[in-house]
Amino acid sequence: DWVCEMQHVILGAGPAGVAAAYDLSLLGHDVVICEREERPGGMLRYGIPAFRLPRNILDVELHNALRLGVQLRTGVEIGNGEGQVPMSKLESEFDAVLLATGCMAASPLPLRGEWETRDLRGIEGVEYGLDFLMQMHRGVAKTVGKRVAVVGAGFTALDCARVAARLGAAEVTIHIRTAEEYIPVTQEEIFEAKREGVRIKG
């Protein structure tokens, strides 16, 4: 087998970063993963609720992927600010730098008219779904109102609705633009959400 030993640093310990580290380790390379968060997993840990992806299962899978000698450094932020690690330092210390920083950014809602250019984060009581879920998983205490409206039709929308119900919202409604049968999630997810009191309105 052809093996070329190199020292790699991977930025991001999400699914892509961990998978790359595993494959590179199998090829005989030395691998270091730098992760901004305190624990690895990326979107799997910080964007998916534990009731949908149990953390013990996630931790076992991550352990199996990283057990080949991969070094994991958490709490590392790349940049030129105070306490950050400059990219130039990584480029000088390693043979290759792999960017696997993930998709942990909320997608803006496509609104028209006066709302088109407005940042919804500045409105009291309005949050982007991914921001809401990540804050929950980082241990930021959240409160919700008695009535919660979720706009969207994917897994993130259902996760937010189910989390809001668990936080004590008396009424949680998911508002969608299409018919329920076209929602891009599994029927099991829809069943579980409804069983927990979530309503879906098209």
Where are these regions (language model features)?
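Extreme N-terminal leader/targeting segments of oxidoreductases
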Residues: 1-7, 60, 123-129
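Rossmann-like dinucleotide/flavin-binding elements
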Residues: 9-34, 73-93, 105-109, 129-187
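Glycine-rich, phosphate-binding/catalytic loops in enzymes
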Residues: 27-28, 50, 114-118, 167
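Rossmann-like dinucleotide-binding cores of NAD(P)H-dependent redox enzymes
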Residues: 33, 37-68, 161-202
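Residue-level detector of structured alpha->beta connecting loops
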Residues: 69, 94-95
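Generic structural signal for residues in well-ordered beta-strands
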Residues: 70-74, 126, 200
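N-terminal Rossmann-like NAD(P) cofactor-binding module of classical short-chain dehydrogenase/reductase
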Residues: 98
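Flavin (primarily FAD) binding-site architecture
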Residues: 101-121, 126
